[in-house]
């Protein structure tokens, strides 16, 4: 066991984190550069949890089957911030946000018990009613194709992808670590999708990942 400060970030250094949360154990696995790696990591994680007598589902007092409440958050990005598709192509994030806004089933089909403006992952049209009008203005300023300003997409959307209180962490599309002006640890080119509940089986989780990969590829090809 190594204690102290974490080493400087380096794409050659892979790590995973296990953190106790109220009622759940949060596991952040290392990035996967291929579908085969993601499948292997996910199946291994579920298998190790099962052997430790840990589950990804629970039953309510009335017998209803539900998730753990911990969430199955999905992080997308690149090996380095320069490789991040969301910093290279701001219109990719704009396409994903509007696609989710036009297809509410993507927000609710895989969600947990708590949805809406006061949930952990409110949609962009749930938190504030005027946000859609401001979002329209922001998207009009969004350039098409690749850009050289990595901060551009963050500045255009940081005040919109929030909850009722303006917290960027509690949003369906979390850009806390996209290109935050606050610290180096917030400029990683990462997008976190927080609207997914923990699935009961590894294959269901992989199905969700496959759907997201397909939508990202579609929006990259046809913004």
Over which residues does each language-model region extend?
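C-terminal accessory/tail domains of diverse enzymes
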Residues: 1-68, 79-223
